[in-house]
Swiss-Prot record:
It comes from Brucella abortus (strain 2308). SUPFAM superfamilies: ITPase-like (SSF52972). The record marks 15, 80, 163 as: Important for substrate specificity. It is an enzyme of class 3 (hydrolase). Residues 28-48 are annotated as: Disordered. It is found in: Cytoplasm. This is dTTP/UTP pyrophosphatase.
Amino acid sequence: MNVQHKLVLASGSPRRIELLGQAGIEPDRIHPADIDETPQRAEHPRSLARRLSRDKARKAHEQLQGEAGFSGALVLAADTVVAVGRRILPKAEIEDEARECLRLLSGRTHKVFTGVCLVLPNGNLRQTLVETRLRFERLSRLQINAYLSSGEWRGKAGGYAIQGLAGSFVVKLVGSYTNVVGLPLQETVGLLADGGYPVYANWGTGKV
């Protein structure tokens, strides 16, 4: 494959890998970019998602420079942020964080922002930002405790995974479902196609 058609995913997220596979896209390399994800003072959730996706893409691109076979590859990165109003919810790592997230989301509308950034072989950036609005039903103590016991919340933005048990909490969703999972598929495929990646190459090969 032409090096300019090689794709590096700057994320180790199984959900993002699966979503790309759903569109017939298999990255040539998985290269997670480790960056400081701390929000800046008074930073809007939308701005945070955009900035982090850009920083991840740039870092991965820089790390691959001079590496045989990948220095001219396309680099794709994404970051998902969940917010209630302007309050950014954490990627829950401990149960108390997840409990607080679920308490805040209970009966409320919240927004999920995913920034997607593509670094072209010449180093130029292409970005998009997708917003989805959701509302959870009012959660009982039983529901919250049961969900916490499942462990699905661990490492998830906002303390839940919509593609799992928490999908049963959703009363209303406006926008991209795959955005909430972690990668807005329609917009990402469009970004890759515009960047010169052969997104439809595998559709007629039986590899999808």
